[in-house]
Amino acid sequence: MVRASYLQIYNENISDLLKTERSSLQIREDKKRGVFVEGLSEWAVRTPHEIYSLMQRGAMVRATAATKMNDVSSRSHAVFIMIVEQMTMQDQSQTDPSKQIKVGKLNLVDLAGSERVRVTGATGKRLEECKKIN
């Protein structure tokens, strides 16, 4: 089974790029799940095309803006997460075989553009974004 999620960190707020509502999500940690983003949607995917479609969908709503250096500059950090699970059966000869689940997680990270304010001439909203990017 493969699941995918896509989030952005913009102005110190985490949001789900695959949901229509833009609520601020929280990072949590527990013994079973480790570090996770509470409320982040997970989408079951079966093909590379489905993965690419989710990436495109999230990229369309990601925070971007024009600067003097780039026509389209990402203003948020983004993380595309893929979780792969594999279930195997242990010793099939037993009447009650135990199951083993292997989990792999891949985080694809795209960091926000951090152009120098002096070079880009950022003011107003762009200047406030620059302060929070790093």
Regions found by a protein language model. Give the residues of each.
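P-loop NTPase "switch/coupling" elements that transmit nucleotide state to mechanical/effector output
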Residues: 1-134
